[in-house]
Amino acid sequence: MALALVLNSGSSSIKFQLVNPANHATDDPFVSGLVEQIGEKMGRIILKIEGEKVVKEAPIADHSAGLSMSFDLMTEHGCGPSQVDIIAVGHRVVHGGILFSAPELITDEIVEMIRDLIPLAPLHNPANIDGIEVARRILPDVPHVAVFDTGFFHSLPPAAALYAINKDVAAEYGIRRYGFHGTSHEYVSSRVVDLMDKPAEEINTITFHLGNGASMAAVKGGVAVDTSMGMTPLAGLVMGTRTGDIDPGVVFHLARNANMSIDEIDNLMNKKSGVKGLSGVNDFRELHQMIEDGDQDAWSAYNIYIHQLRRYLGSYMVALGRVDCLVFTAGVGENAHFVREDALAGLEMYGIKVDPERNKLPNDGPRLISTDDSTVKVFVIPTNEELAIARYSAKFAE
């Protein structure tokens, strides 16, 4: 069985899967793994091999050690790199800037180009590069492919992509809307073609990727025309710990009046804000329970979250002119029926009618949650970025 190794390397963790690129969307990966607490006193490797869970705790010095130890553990259970047919390695890379609009075969030159983009993604691209360099050393004889979160949004028209800031400054420092979660938005907007009785080029879709990080996209005939995240993943919707859209003047206000440094403000807006900053939690199950218990902070946080979803929904309905379907995906989008219900409440005049019973069904594959007479079809489609990356990567092994 030909397999692709898919790597998502973070600052202190590595997520990976061994995936058959020929899998159906609902098929489980052959192996999934998580290396966490890299560089701390004690780290942990969690493997799931054909449904069986394997856990190992040990100090993990760096990404190289984490991946090597994971491969050793896989070998102990009969699925190491020398025991299975790995035909390609796909790497999730957060930021491709304006340089990369499609997956790229990784070479030394490509690595340096990704390194040059670190100022645009200082929290993510360095870790992505670590994963690339480690994997290329361990698996030097298979193609390694970079798949960029930003790639799907290279099609944004100038009116959506450019900011009203001095054009010379923007050009010098790469200031523009790049968008993120592109692999997920592209995946679910292509999957919806299987559920609609129309060719892809005739389908206008609004996609909701709602996880701890959250974004929306307007997709016209399979091509992205707008998205909520911007130059960074901080913009747009209210998120688990991120502010989403906020007046840039808040940064100046905090610097001048709270004597906060740029790094402190960065940390505040990325890690201590959003739903958690407003309510104390960023798990929507906890938030929902707090609301039912009468917690006013939780209620306020939820209302702000829903308000922002509806603002972007209205904006994208106008941008597209005609909307054929809405798609919810990712952790919150797939599992929080109350978010979907409240985000779309009262929109019957626009042809959006959610079926309450369908909406509350458990998350079990792609499904329609709108009524039969809803002009705009509403779907829940589980995202599968790993399968998408595996398929992109396998093409380079053909």
Swiss-Prot record:
Enzyme class: transferase
Catalytic activity, as annotated: acetate + ATP = acetyl phosphate + ADP
Co-factor: note: Mg(2+). Can also accept Mn(2+).
Binding site for substrate: R92
Keyword Secreted on entry: no
Catalytic residue positions: D149 (proton donor/acceptor)
Binding site for Mg(2+): N8, E385
Cofactor names: Mg(2+); Mn(2+)
Subcellular compartments: Cytoplasm
UniProt keywords, alphabetically: ATP-binding, Cytoplasm, Kinase, Magnesium, Metal-binding, Nucleotide-binding, Transferase
UniProt-annotated binding residues for ATP: K15, H209, L210, G211, N212, G213, D283, F284, R285, G331, V332, G333, E334, N335
GO MF assignments: acetate kinase activity; ATP binding; magnesium ion binding
One Pfam assignment: Acetate_kinase
Keyword Transmembrane helix (UniProt): no
Pathway annotation: Metabolic intermediate biosynthesis; acetyl-CoA biosynthesis; acetyl-CoA from acetate: step 1/2
Gene3D superfamilies: 3.30.420.40
UniProt site positions, description: Transition state stabilizer: H181, R242
GO biological processes: acetate metabolic process; acetyl-CoA biosynthetic process
InterPro entries to which the protein is assigned, alphabetical: Ac/propionate_kinase (IPR004372), Aliphatic_acid_kin_short-chain (IPR000890), Aliphatic_acid_kinase_CS (IPR023865), ATPase_NBD (IPR043129)
Subunit: Homodimer.
Functional note: Catalyzes the formation of acetyl phosphate from acetate and ATP. Can also catalyze the reverse reaction.
Sequence similarity: Belongs to the acetokinase family.
HAMAP family linked to this entry: Acetate_kinase
Name of the protein: Acetate kinase
